[in-house]
Curated annotation (Swiss-Prot):
Lineage: Eukaryota, Metazoa, Ecdysozoa, Arthropoda, Hexapoda
Superkingdom in the source lineage: Eukaryota
Name of protein: Possible lysine-specific histone demethylase 1
GO cellular component: chromatin; nucleus; transcription repressor complex
Alphabetized InterPro entries for the sequence: Amino_oxidase (IPR002937), FAD/NAD-bd_sf (IPR036188), Flavin_monoamine_oxidase (IPR050281), Hist_Lys-spec_deMease (IPR017366), Homeodomain-like_sf (IPR009057), SWIRM (IPR007526), WH-like_DNA-bd_sf (IPR036388)
Binding site for FAD: 267-295
Keywords: Chromatin regulator, Chromosome, Coiled coil, FAD, Flavoprotein, Nucleus, Oxidoreductase, Phosphoprotein, Repressor, Transcription, Transcription regulation
Primary localisation category: nucleus
Amino acid sequence: MKPTQFGGSSSKMTEPIEYVTLISDDSDGEPTPKRNVNHPPSALSAPNPGQKQKHPDEDSNDAPATSDERRTSRRNRPKVDYSNRPSGSGDTASNDKSGSASMGPNNQQAERRSQSQTRKSEANATSSSVSGPSAGNSRPSQNGDSKDRDAGTPTVLSGQEGAVFQSRLPFNKMTPNEEACFPDISRSGILGHRVFLNIRNSLLHMWVDNPKIQLSFEIALKNLPPPFDSEPSLVRRVHSFLERHGFINFGIFKRLKPIPAKKLGKVIVIGAGISGLAVAHQLQQFGMDVIVLEARDRVGGRISTFRKNSYIADVGAMVVTGVYGNPMTILSKQIGMDLVPIQQTCPLYGPDGKPVPKEKDDVIEREFNRLLESASYLSHRLDFNYAGDCPVSLGDALEWIISMQEMQVMHKRGQHMQEIIATQTKIIEQRRRLKTLRDTIGKLKNEHLAMINQRKPKGTDGDLKYCYQEFNIRNTQIKMEETISTFHDLHAEEKQMLAKLHELEQNRPSDVYLSSRDRLILDWHFANLEFANATRLNNLSLKHWDQDDDFEFIGHHTTVRNGYSCVPVALTENLDIRVNSAVKEIKYGTKGVEVVAENLKTSNSQMTYKADLVVCTLTLGVLKVAVAHKESQQSNTVKFDPPLPDWKQQAIKRLGFGNLNKVVLCFDRIFWDPNANLFGHVGSTTASRGEMFLFWSISSSPVLLALVAGMAANLVESVTDDIIIGRCMSVLKNIFGNTSVPQPKETVVTRWRSDPWARGSYSYVSVGSSGSDYDLLAAPVIPPSSKDAEGLPRLFFAGEHTIRNYPATVHGAYLSGLREAGRIADYYLGYPEGTPPDIGYSVAEAANLVSVGNVVKLRDLSPNLSDSSPSSKKSEENSNSNTADSTELQ
């Protein structure tokens, strides 16, 4: 999650990188959106189909290897409007309030490498939107404004198409999960598909248009246009399917039908973070008895908001990373989240506190993106992912590329010096020849003059001697003239050589690839990328670190003015949540589960809870402690009985869990530019590059939030608050002056790694891991005592570390909760309402295909975003029988 990706520099490098010649410089440019005349006016503009694609890896979601969003291929993405607005109303939509369904478009550029990105900013403890990919990727432009950002953005989607896009589903074809749950429709041919898709898309449109009120079957049937309302049984099935899997009727809304009084099963949810609250809320709506156990004295987990007097600051998750397709957009309409788009200007200040010149910043940012492109090229094109038997990290690859560039610069310097020496040698030799010719000319001139002076008149010594005398005079004159001509030619050549030597001396190559100052600015971008991934670059998998980039949401990245904690607080409505209850042991078997929890307010007071199943939303950091096989008295050590299967434990160990910390500074007045949400500070050393490298100002109140990433994020956990605050103040005074910066009134320093209930910030794909580990972490566990290998799972998992396509984000954690609620309902409640008994599909098989939020890549969400690469065309041909023409679905 990756950071937000912003526009890259358009500056030209004075000298291209030799080994990157296969990567076009055009990767920094935006492709011009193209209209598809075969589709209705509301259709999306498609990205340039000529962009290169990287071949997908068999066990990963590797995105196309364009130059990369973080990675730096920038892709135009569509804007979405969910109202029945004419396609020409894009300008109006862009002026809507950020909290509405049709938020202003942002020309987000998902860079596959810059990670920066973009990127994982959120599910966890601290994230934001700079870098990046990603996305990764690059930092906000210093001179960007909203008009420039929106220029050239694709057309807004409206109506059904916009609602389906918001639901992360393809508009004109069934998903694998839908085909599994509707096998009769899947086999019925194109007409049956059209009927299904029209019903499904209409229901999604009804829900997205008004998510504050329950969309009941009766209302849905009443509002369906004919002839689709003529099959109430199919409408009921589609409605039940969408409701079960979290596409409609999720979040906080007014129920028109009461929750079933008879409870259909008992569930224990461990953790009241966003994923735990999502699954608990859904299962309660489904009629199950749910208890939530939370070790903290509050809900929200890594969503935590500091509130004191008029000061508000999110010390955990902070940014809504893209509004189109994001379930947080629906929640914002339900609970009054005050979403504020992030301004993209981000001035950068050097170690001396002086602004970094824009030209220099542009050049270094461009080089940063090219380095990421080169790393992607090494991994995905050259398959250079191992050094011997050891997997290569992104950090290693980047440093190797920099070293190769340094060697290339040294080689060029050597070549240049050799050329100078060769030219100087030629000039010396030329001057020797000129001196010889000059002497020869003088000698011939003297001989010629002597002959003239000694010349005898004709007839004095006879005709023969006279002729001989004249011959010698003329011959000497000819030799002298020829020698003078040769001298002039050589002198002209000497002038050319001198001009060439002067040019060589005036155009000496750089002494180094990066000067010490340039390297520090590059390190700022690396720190930004480390912030996006919550870890040092040396810990990231070279091949898979950005495996989720193709699924990033588009649109503005926003902050929540009234604090992100308003979301988990709202989701606690009518839930039975036991705070201060630290789970110590989870026992699961074929007959049910038992969870032993300790009440932290009354020491040594333990309670045992029994249920049919348990949903574990413990963070990956806490799970790592649980499977470490070390006896520990830590308060957050959880024991699984029986132990988790080896495949689950190995995935927990392989996947990385990073750290990112924040420093909140509350002042009595604003002394920085109130129009800028961000400003960066370049560290004085590579080792300290992540130390207070970025400052956020996300509200109208005088509050600054400093980010501490990479190596520095772990170091600050062992340092006192006074030292950290002092360092922050030193940086600010260096930038704004001693007299301009007052002492803070309130301060907060986070230490997420030391937090016993978090053990870090959010997940990342570490060296030796891949996207498939997210799938393994998401898989439910069947008790080993079960005689049936396909027995009933009793242990389920949710959280940002369990969702492959949206890891390290709040929306990913929330979607994982919806996913598990649907999976549990399939296993324990049976077929959705209205499903015929002879439908011919296994409910367990359907449960295994549950994929809320894991449906398709962004480019597959609309017929106008289809990929024209050969591989995608082949895939399209193979699925033709399951695809309905979008023009016929209107």
